[in-house]
Amino acid sequence: PILQRELGERFEAPAAFDKLIADGRKGKKVEKGFYRYGAAVKKGRKEVDTSVYALLGIQPSGRLSSEQISNRCMVQMLNEAVRCLEEGIIASARDGDIGAIFGIGFPPFLGGPFRYIDSLGITALVADLRRYEQQFGARFTPCNMLLSMAEEGRSFY
């Protein structure tokens, strides 16, 4: 709620979370959430608690690949990193890369979010964000700095 109040719909929690919390599904510490817990579950494996589907009134509709899942999460994080630079929260792409690696555990072999954006290509990142924006809404809208850099063919390094 705090992030949503300060930053708007980009950080709005899905309505499903309210239903899960109301049902006492707070995860591992209470052994009830999205997944099954306890002795019946093999250690190191995550099994979906299928009763969650009825609670949320949904049916699973296929599987996303690991790559699709990680890409959808990653593009939002990359967009927010650039937004931090755009808003002056960080002074440089280098500061953002160092901060992300040491502060939030961004994979060092990718060089940090800004170095990683350069390796992907800003135009490709903007295209991914636009595609997700069409599917999932404004939380995937590319920030202005990304749009202008893509238009001008610029990079961070």
Task: Kindly give the residue locations of the regions a language model identified.
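N-terminal glycine-rich phosphate-binding loop for ADP-containing cofactors
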Residues: 1-157
